[in-house]
UniProtKB/Swiss-Prot annotation:
Residues of the KH type-2 domain: 205-282
Transferase as UniProt keyword: no
Protein name: GTPase Era
Function, in words: An essential GTPase that binds both GDP and GTP, with rapid nucleotide exchange. Plays a role in 16S rRNA processing and 30S ribosomal subunit biogenesis and possibly also in cell cycle regulation and energy metabolism. The Era binding site on the 30S subunit overlaps that of protein S1 and is in direct contact with 5 nucleotides directly upstream of the anti-Shine-Dalgarno sequence; the presence of Era may prevent mRNA recruitment. 30S subunits bound to Era are not able to bind to the 50S subunit to make functional ribosomes. Era may serve a role in the final stages of 30S ribosomal subunit assembly.
Keywords: Cell inner membrane, Cell membrane, Cytoplasm, GTP-binding, Membrane, Nucleotide-binding, Ribosome biogenesis, RNA-binding, rRNA-binding
Region feature G5, mapped onto this chain: 152-154
Binding site for GTP: 14-21, 61-65, 125-128
Amino acid sequence: MAEKTYSGFVAIVGKPNVGKSTLLNNLLGVKVAPISPRPQTTRKRLRGILTEGRRQIVFVDTPGLHKPMDALGEFMDQEVYEALADVNAVVWVVDLRHPPTPEDELVARALKPLVGKVPILLVGNKLDAAKYPEEAMKAYHELLPEAEPRMLSALDERQVAELKADLLALMPEGPFFYPEDYAKSDQTFGEWVAEILREEAMKRLWHEVPYAVATKVEEVAERENGVLYIKAILYVERPSQKAIVIGEGGRKIKEIGQATRKQLEALLGKKVYLDLEVKVYPDWRKDPEALRELGYRSSVG
């Protein structure tokens, strides 16, 4: 008789820039989600697959829930609500360094319909950097008293391991959604590279420019000498933004490219040749068709 298996979906939600993607990466033990100090680094749902023994979790990392200002923002919020439609548990991540904001209240309202249906874990993150974590946690818990509160740092291996064990234990009996040897993410290789490129661009650009950048991988080829050739495009909305991304004498795009290549080589364990180009796609964030062309494939518009 076959052993029982347990599996389910866990949505990771929260306002922008609270550490959702860092937590996902550390739950999986491998980098699948982009990270930068800027809000809204995550723009679309990303599935991370964790299989341990006879238990499997499909984590759904979501964009930060916020008041949308354009079609991209509407897409990002839609990604959150769709992720909550059919889950077995929710991890609501908040930042213990600060008291709740209207965006946290927005998340709490989005989770209200799930109360009593699935477990909701209120995870107070950045415990290592918070001055008054207990006070902050109490304020967050008051927004959704039915949630189960816990405090941690997404960078603390022991604390993350404890959360992972508790989540695995919550999974209902059922077949695995992905084979045991499946990759840690449902992203294609090109999507994964594009997100790393966008992460490095966001770290090095300022004001509105990082939010106007979209990235797309056009070609991946293994050369005879073993070097991995990658052709990628960075899209911006205006010629002035293109000039900023390229930089004086091409210095900025070179800096972005070098950082991306180094990260890819470290993660892949092989040499990478990164061929970058910057193009203008006017007002792509406001255009539903442009969003679909650039890989944001939900039913926006």
